[in-house]
């Protein structure tokens, strides 16, 4: 039978085998698979892959990079990152240790978000062309469509998480979104919560975890950042999950439109 898992599914299976299923081992296995020097562009942040010689200067550099990220409503994420770091001084003192788990410059997350969130707001999140039959337009304004789907109806949505990352963005969305950028975000996502992605009982409700991130009502989104127990690591992980899922969702939204357009053209030709 043909393997339908796709590149991400195959990667997860390989990592699960190498790590023996334990989340700590999985994280270590993922980190070990990443190149030491990484395919970073010339303008990659200076704090990437460098020892924490000066905790304060590293924190300042990280703050500057995080300044470009925003909440679903457009508000800055940085205050919530700072609050998380304040409550967890150990992670704030050695930010490079936390960042080392996520081999993707935070500017990459901002690039992905800026390129995808607007289109998704119109289509996928607002009950557009990918809406499940019988659920189009039934969600309150500002809430993600998936919040109203049953668990069974959410299963097809999980398919959007198993695509090849570069395919999520056609060339027309900007040359700055290079494959190395998207692959870095993929790595960050896998580091963030491998136990969620690898367990059957949790991956089925993965979209439930993402609902606050996709909601325009940012109260729950802010609460999520304030309640993180592991500081900067979890905060960056949540951001990685948000933007990678945006990328994959956009990919499926565009594919849906392209398929519909192809069918329409074929019908016109046949008639």
Swiss-Prot record:
Intrachain disulfide bonds: none
Gene Ontology BP term (one): negative regulation of transcription by RNA polymerase II
Any one GO molecular function term: STAT family protein binding
Signal peptide: none
GO cellular component: nucleus
PANTHER family from the UniProt entry: PROTEIN FAM220A, PROTEIN FAM220BP-RELATED
Protein name, as recorded: Putative protein FAM220BP
Organism: Homo sapiens
Lineage of source species: Eukaryota, Metazoa, Chordata, Craniata, Vertebrata
